[in-house]
Amino acid sequence: MAAGTQFDFGNARLASMSKQPRIGIFVCHCGINIGGVVKVPEVVERVRALPGVVAARDYQYCCSDPGQNIIRETIEKEGLSRVVVACCSPTLHEKTFRKACAAAGINPYMCEVANIREQCSWVTKDRDQATDKAFDIIAMTVARVANSEPLVAAGVPVTKRALVIGAGLAGIQAALDIANAGYETVLVEKEPSIGGHVARLASVFPNFDKAQEMLDAKLREVCGLRRVKLLTGSEVVEVSGQIGNFKVRIRRKPTQAQGSVPDSPDDGGQETEELVGAIVMATGHELMPVSRLRQYGGGQVPDVIDALQFERLLAGNGTVRRPSDGRVPKRVVFVQCAGSRDKEHGVPYCSKVCCMYAAKQAMLYKRRVPDGDAVVCYIDVRTPGKGSEEFYRQATQEGVRYVRGKVSKIFRSGDRCTVWSADTLAGCKVVLEADLVVLAMAMVPNPAGVSLARQLKLQLDANGFLTEAHPKLRPVETLTGGFFLAGTCQGPKDILETTVQASAASAKVLAILGQDELLREPTVACVDEDVCVGCGNCELTCAYSAVTIDPQRRKAVVNVALCEGCGACAVACPSGAMSHKNFSKRSVYEMVDQI
């Protein structure tokens, strides 16, 4: 659940529930954003007649310091017990106004925002219609706040340890950042070794740095840090708890010498339990198997390989040799978007890094085989990022040929491969004879990572990548509190972007671990046990595992530490037992009555 806001209650009247609520309304002009469309003075006069309203004022910018002072002074002067501020979206300034109310002695959750900017003045051109609509929105908010109850955010202690799932480059970077800040980190990797795909690369663009040399420094550091608990050959089995306090069950796969047998048929390895406060998902990606592209000879023609296989051919210092017969290929054709941007045979998205690593591989091949011919068949060359366009131009200057057109078929012809393509710039069909074909296969989510994400009820997009809470404002957070994203588990990206995202995720983790306790928003689901019949609809609907059915009593139970307050359970409940604090059914009915 989202962390609560730190309010200084001061003399806040937590039990400000007098029989006759005293409601104050403050209407903001927001410059001309609201005042230029809505007749604010008219609205102020009309809202004074609403039940329970004892004060109504307008001000140019209520969010300013003078505006907040007016709110505080009016609360004290009129003895207000509830406040409605008619202004912009509550996302922007709800916390601002609630803090002002708390400072004046009102429970902050007795303050509500009526959005008359985004939902009224910005979308309604007619002044009379906008004025009537603004009044209706305020009237509904008054009906809601009249039924509100004083709430207090509860504090939850924080376990000052972190878990990183996946020990590729993203996971290693995140673990190092967290550990170097002074917190113990559990780094879990399902493979026997760490390093991920980067460990399999010959070099990286745009400077041709040796990938292994670059990675070795990270590996030595992470293996040498006492604050990093590295668990290879292990996988996360179960995660329970909530942000600040997760209990993680990890199974370590059994290791046997070749030819040995397990001690028992069900020997699944040793299980351990770790307590952590935050979790970084760095489960990475895989390349789509070449066997899925039968039209390209994938899985049928031995000299049709993917880019990672070609990296291994480039890894040594010797001559490049093709898999089928060990001969030096005199012509290598690189096929771009093999499975990417192809809804029929692969995935609809661009894999983002293929254009750059194909240019790198083509240049490395030309340097190893000076008399060789490197041809890149592409749909579009995409070169985002610093130095990328210059890198592509360097490839053309070093003799790499680019042919714009979609490859339609690849098949074996004698001891060579025949590539059918097109040159859309020249407007003709192209037939290329190649000794070796390298497919830039689509980057797809790691299947094990997808399975784990589904088990943890983390959100996935249509392609199976983990989904961020907001693509612009919360790019490394998930909708489940305490889980953060790093690397290609969230989508295709290069090494630079992966490292940056890993450090961003670790910074979010440190923001949690640096607190002694987390405040939980009290606006959560609640259940009326007298009405609940234990049908379980709420449990099935909850995306955060916050609602369960007590097996003995057959009643719904809400874990307030997990609840995000989304209200899905209240919608799904057929008996009406599930509700939401300060957004009860009674509040909703009375809000509707105001229209």
Question: What are the language-model segments listed below?
Answer:
Residues 1-595:
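Residues forming the flavin
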